[in-house]
Amino acid sequence: MAELNLKGNRRVLTGVVVSDKADKTIVVRCETLVKHSLYKKYIRRHTKFMAHDPSNECGIGDKVQIVEFRPLSRRKRWHLDKILEKAV
């Protein structure tokens, strides 16, 4: 699930790394639960964020925490905060 916290004025998200092919960039998939307005059933929604990984330490499947940052490129506005769990 995507946990949304505020770190000062910056948003903090938790997700899973789905790609680490680009240099110093990871793609993080963040899932969230949304309640359907008519059927009252919870539905999983996901969003992908590109995040800056300065030391290329993340791998596919790692659970990470990312924090909102200044724009680094057209799609990169997030920065790797910490690795919560390494993939096996």
From Swiss-Prot:
This is Small ribosomal subunit protein uS17. GO terms for cellular component: cytosolic small ribosomal subunit. NCBIfam families: PRK05610.1, uS17_bact. SUPFAM superfamilies: Nucleic acid-binding proteins. Keywords: Ribonucleoprotein, Ribosomal protein, RNA-binding, rRNA-binding. Belongs to the universal ribosomal protein uS17 family. GO terms for molecular function: rRNA binding; structural constituent of ribosome. It comes from the Bacteria. Part of the 30S ribosomal subunit. InterPro entries: NA-bd_OB-fold (IPR012340), Ribosomal_uS17 (IPR000266), Ribosomal_uS17_bact/chlr (IPR019984), Ribosomal_uS17_CS (IPR019979). GO terms for biological process: translation.
